[in-house]
Amino acid sequence: MKVVFVSYEVFPFAKVGGLADVAGTLPKYLKKHGVDVTIVMPKHRIVEKNAEKFGYEIKKVAESLSVSHVKTDQKFDIYESVLPGSDVKTYFVANDYYFSAEDVYAGPDLGEQAIFFCAATLDLVKHLDLKPDIVHVNDWQTALIPVYLKTVYRDDPYFSRTATVLTIHNLGYQGVFDPKYLSFAGLPDYVYTIDGLEFYGQLNFLKGGIVFSDVINTVSPTYAEEIQTEEYGEKLDGVLRMRSKDLYGILNGIDYELYNPATDRYIYVNYDVNRLELKWENKVKLQEELGLPVNKETAVAGLISRLVPQKGLDLLVDVMDYLTLFDLQIVVLGTGDEQYENAFRKFQERYPDKVSANIKFDVELAQKIYAGADIFLMPSRYEPCGLGQMFSMRYGTIPVVRYTGGLADTVKEYDPQSMEGTGFGFKKYDSAHLLKAVSKALHFYYREKDHWRRIMTNAMNTDLSWDRSAKEYVDLYKKALAKVGR
């Protein structure tokens, strides 16, 4: 089975969010399950910068190629590399006009960029003769590929047996643009209807992918159910309900080689489930590095997140003053909306012995927090899958979450009777319930030491690997092939 896996960001070539982690790991595990997978992504400016840092080579294999169907004079080059730690070939669509910004999600025109990339990807596939059985696209930036295949390429024998899979990593980002982009894309007018890409007078790229893909999945079973409701459906719940028979939920995994406290080169002291006492050495070193009072007995709660409303930060901001009354230090890492960045900076000024606000993106510090914290905070308003809670569990750091989406599928409330469970959480979206969940975690941390150790071992022994997920994706690909009569 040949799969072309298309993503706008792939770790370690270019990373902004969790999509890059998925796209940089799932293909490795698909390969282990016998799938002949090839990655295609844009050649962002950061790709060359990261080559030395992450030890990969990149070379040009074709140049000055025209883009079919799109109304543009822009050409593209093709570059090639290999995904580090694997033998997965990765091809890059290179164009300095569209992909030279410092930020992966910046540039002269995001709509044009996505259209150019989608169309160029199909030209790349033909130019390199990749002959895919499956084209697997991710999120709105790549969602027009199934639209192209079902319309302007419908009678092209090269793609006649190719099936499409769309993975929705976050329904909140849809790629909504002026209808004029339809003409630029070279797509037929008939797709601009309520049953196609039309969306409240605009053009919705993700909706196009939902309508035209053979099968669709999102990144947890609970989120697949939630997005078919008005509350979580982001105005696409109707079309998702129409496609419900072709909509699946597959939990993401994490890369066990990359995220392993026994070998992680970024953390202060390596440890494993049989040497948990070494985890506290990481806490002491973290406190020292961040200028917090050093005390291995004091509970440390970590928050590593984009600082945006989706992440439930309004709840956390509401209860921060109360949380500082506990014997608790709170370490924040992330960037995002100015209101949250400023709020956490002010909390640090007000409570310098209690709060460390690190308003930046820092992979190394993130790993140190996963290893050094006792508790991991994730009170999300919604969470398609979430990786932070998985990373924290892998490192024996206990998640306190709102039970939604993938958080509900991965974190199980600890039951002291059965001694089963991996964390603590709450369902109702309000700050009082968050405070209650943190209080419960702190009760076990300070007063039920044996139970706390059991929760840590439960969390670290939970199977969160990509191996499990990859098997489910292989089954999904078979369902997609059945849709095209194969």
From Swiss-Prot:
GO terms for biological process: glycogen biosynthetic process. Keywords: Glycogen biosynthesis, Glycosyltransferase, Transferase. It holds the Pfam family Glycos_transf_1. NCBIfam families: glgA (TIGR02095). This is Glycogen synthase. Its EC number is 2.4.1.21. Transmembrane segments: none annotated. GO terms for molecular function: alpha-1,4-glucan glucosyltransferase (ADP-glucose donor) activity; alpha-1,4-glucan glucosyltransferase (UDP-glucose donor) activity. The gene is glgA. It catalyses: [(1->4)-alpha-D-glucosyl](n) + ADP-alpha-D-glucose = [(1->4)-alpha-D-glucosyl](n+1) + ADP + H(+). InterPro entries: Glyco_trans_1, GS/SS, Starch_synth_cat_dom. Belongs to the glycosyltransferase 1 family. Bacterial/plant glycogen synthase subfamily. ADP-alpha-D-glucose binds at residue 15. Pathway: Glycan biosynthesis; glycogen biosynthesis. Gene3D superfamilies: Glycogen Phosphorylase B. It comes from the Bacteria. Synthesizes alpha-1,4-glucan chains using ADP-glucose. It comes from Thermotoga maritima (strain ATCC 43589 / DSM 3109 / JCM 10099 / NBRC 100826 / MSB8).
